From Swiss-Prot:
Identification of the protein by name: UPF0145 protein HDEF_1024
PANTHER family hit by this protein: UPF0145 PROTEIN YBJQ
Alphabetical list of Gene3D superfamilies matching this protein: Hypothetical protein apc22750. Chain B
Record-annotated disulphide pairs: none
Lineage: Bacteria, Pseudomonadati, Pseudomonadota, Gammaproteobacteria, Enterobacterales
Organism: Hamiltonella defensa subsp. Acyrthosiphon pisum (strain 5AT)
InterPro entries per the UniProt record, alphabetical: UPF0145_dom_sf (IPR035439), UPF0145_YbjQ-like (IPR002765)
Pfam families in alphabetical order: YbjQ_1
Listed NCBIfam families: PRK02877.1 (NF002776)
Length: 108
């Protein structure tokens, strides 16, 4: 499955548009990891604990979107948009939403 944020893929012809596909992931951060992330992992303005959760959530959302695209008969998703949000009453969850257009492509 090819994925791109652009509306086309260089070297390929889009032969069929199959519809919008989405993928979402909401991950609750471990409360103890949250508590100590600022102390233990915060180096140079970055938190390894949060970055790992972000990568995990993004992979889940991409897998969900690609699985839906495959079920439609697509071999690529174009025009992908990725949104990140912190949600929950105490901002304790991370949400990643991904969407794009499932297409059938062929090499030129």
């Amino acid at each position: 499955m090819k994925n791109t944020t652009t509306p086309t893929l260089q070297g390929y012809d889009i032969r069929e548009y199959l519809g919008i596909v989405t993928g979402e992931a909401i991950l609750g951060a471990n409360i103890f990891k949250d508590l100590f992330a600022g102390i233990r992992d915060f180096v140079g303005g970055r938190s390894n604990a949060y970055e790992k959760e972000l990568i995990k959530a993004r992979k889940i959302a991409f897998n969900e979107m690609n699985s839906t695209a495959e079920s439609l008969g697509a071999n690529a998703v174009v025009g992908i948009n990725i949104d990140y949000e912190v949600v929950g009453t105490s901002n304790s969850m991370l949400m990643v939403s991904i969407y794009g257009t499932a297409v059938k492509i062929f090499s030129l």
